[in-house]
């Protein structure tokens, strides 16, 4: 998310493409311009990221949608992770402080798995009605 200089441009089209194929999960990441020359990339606005989370959840309601570890740190990460919980994403790699509290506050069950978000060995896709937030 945010690959076009921090802007959201092709993400809705990418979700269209992904939604046409039978896949168990989608792992979303947010551009992190740490190693780019200053000014080359901008960090995407958290509200844009949140809108993509909602759209991904809506379009892929029968599949797992996960937030990978690649995302900007600090306040951006805390806000992004809050949006991920509230949008109904199924997992967050290395959740920010407060993400579990948000899940608990809004009544989303959660559990912790010690695995990479892109490797779900032995895990069957969860039905839409029993979504949990893996922290």
Region roles according to the model:
Residues 2-13:
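Canonical radical SAM enzyme core domain
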Residues 13-135:
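Auxiliary Fe-S-binding modules of radical SAM enzymes
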